[in-house]
């Protein structure tokens, strides 16, 4: 029996020396020390031995079990340490490698232009006023002296949510809300998104941005309007810029005008951009209509005012010689990065 135990120990030592992984070690432990393992079977056979040798054999088997448990523990510790070192090496960070550059965002070109326009008027004493983009028909049309049969009120040009609710077609409703809630003097600009049922092409979009201005006080004249817009044009487009008013019609202003600036590309000599005329239209303006003042509870015999409005996209197109308005909305980084 002693010889069998010695042979078993030698067998275990040989198998242990060939083990190369933690999984092989676990299999070895199950084979020899498991519930159905070889050593367990040997211990069960002790009852069949003569009492004279049973104690000695049991002692040798227990000694072998302790040897195997200790050897397995040592091997397991070694394998775990090796795995730990491999993991450490695989997760090692080389602090000398340059870090990845963080891509920093920038203000969108339309926001840049809108902010610059707003800053010019803020420096002239204007305040910023805002209003809802989902608007009532009354504020968007009726209060602005736009009659029911006006083309702008057609469903083909306006996004109606219900009979009396729509997406505002201009930021003029903000002016109405301010005039109804404040007493003159009133001096505001109202930037924001507006919506019109236009087909998308290089110059049109169903969503775009406007900045409108309003000044109401005693003694405000057309000369004040012209002077204000001349200051804006020179500060935004350059001191050499000239301004021209052309008669026009808007239902909410009287008299009304379309405002041109001397072509910023040819200096008024005539080029492809200005179609040879030397002038480029930038906005509409005029004196606030008497009916609009009355609709807001302001006496037109005491107070007068002027209003103007421009498309932010149009101003940006002109300044940067961009030919397609869709570029502003497509989020193409190749385009946007040019204006950082």
From Swiss-Prot:
Gene3D superfamilies in UniProt: Bira Bifunctional Protein, Domain 2 (3.30.930.10)
Keyword Metal-binding: yes
Record key words, sorted: Aminoacyl-tRNA synthetase, ATP-binding, Cytoplasm, Ligase, Magnesium, Metal-binding, Nucleotide-binding, Protein biosynthesis
Catalytic reactions on record: tRNA(Phe) + L-phenylalanine + ATP = L-phenylalanyl-tRNA(Phe) + AMP + diphosphate + H(+)
Transmembrane segments: none
InterPro entries linked to this entry: aa-tRNA-synth_II (IPR006195), aa-tRNA-synth_II/BPL/LPL (IPR045864), Phe-tRNA-synth_IIc_asu (IPR004529), Phe-tRNA_ligase_II_N (IPR004188), Phe_tRNA_ligase_alpha1_bac (IPR022911), Phenylalanyl-tRNA_Synthase (IPR002319), tRNA-bd_arm (IPR010978)
Pfam family, one: Phe_tRNA-synt_N
Cofactor note: Binds 2 magnesium ions per tetramer.
Compartments, as annotated in UniProt: Cytoplasm
Record CDD domains: PheRS_alpha_core (cd00496)
EC annotation from Swiss-Prot or TrEMBL: 6.1.1.20
Cofactor(s) it depends on: Mg(2+)
GO BP term (any one): phenylalanyl-tRNA aminoacylation
PROSITE patterns (UniProt xref): AA_TRNA_LIGASE_II
Assembly and binders: Tetramer of two alpha and two beta subunits.
Family the entry assigns: Belongs to the class-II aminoacyl-tRNA synthetase family. Phe-tRNA synthetase alpha subunit type 1 subfamily.
Identification of the protein by name: Phenylalanine--tRNA ligase alpha subunit
Species: Caldicellulosiruptor bescii (strain ATCC BAA-1888 / DSM 6725 / KCTC 15123 / Z-1320) (Anaerocellum thermophilum)
Recorded name of the encoding gene: pheS
């Amino acid at each position: 029996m002693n010889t069998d135990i010695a042979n078993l120990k030698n067998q275990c030592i040989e198998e242990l020396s060939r083990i190369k992984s933690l999984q092989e070690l676990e299999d070895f432990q199950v084979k020899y020390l498991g519930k159905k393992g070889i050593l367990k079977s040997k211990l069960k056979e002790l009852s069949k031995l003569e009492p004279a040798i049973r104690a000695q054999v049991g002692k040798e088997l227990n000694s072998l079990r302790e040897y195997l448990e200790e050897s397995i523990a040592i091997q397991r510790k070694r394998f775990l340490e090796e795995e730990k070192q491999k993991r450490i090496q695989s997760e090692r960070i080389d602090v000398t490698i340059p870090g990845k550059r963080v891509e920093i965002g920038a203000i969108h070109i339309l926001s840049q232009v809108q902010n610059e326009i707003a800053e010019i008027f803020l420096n002239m004493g204007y305040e910023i006023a805002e209003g809802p983009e989902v608007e009532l028909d009354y504020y968007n049309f009726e209060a602005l002296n736009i009659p029911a049969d006006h083309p702008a009120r057609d469903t083909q040009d306006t996004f109606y949510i219900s009979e009396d609710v729509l997406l505002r077609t201009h930021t003029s409703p903000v002016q109405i809300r301010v005039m109804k809630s404040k007493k003159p003097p009133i001096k505001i600009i109202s930037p924001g998104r507006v919506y019109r049922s236009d087909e998308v092409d290089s110059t049109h979009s169903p969503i775009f941005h406007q900045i409108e201005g309003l000044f109401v006080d005693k003694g405000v004249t057309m000369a004040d309007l012209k002077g204000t817009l001349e200051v804006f044009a020179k500060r935004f487009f350059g001191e050499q810029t000239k301004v021209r008013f052309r008669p026009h019609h808007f239902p909410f202003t009287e008299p009304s005008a379309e405002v041109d600036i001397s072509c910023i590309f040819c200096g008024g000599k005539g080029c492809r951009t200005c179609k040879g005329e030397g002038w480029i239209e930038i906005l509409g303006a005029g004196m606030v209509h008497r009916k609009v003042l009355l609709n807001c509870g302001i006496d037109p015999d005491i107070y007068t005012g002027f209003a103007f409005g421009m498309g932010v996209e149009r101003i940006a197109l002109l300044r940067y010689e961009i030919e397609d308005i869709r570029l502003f909305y497509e989020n193409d980084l190749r385009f946007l990065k040019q204006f950082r």
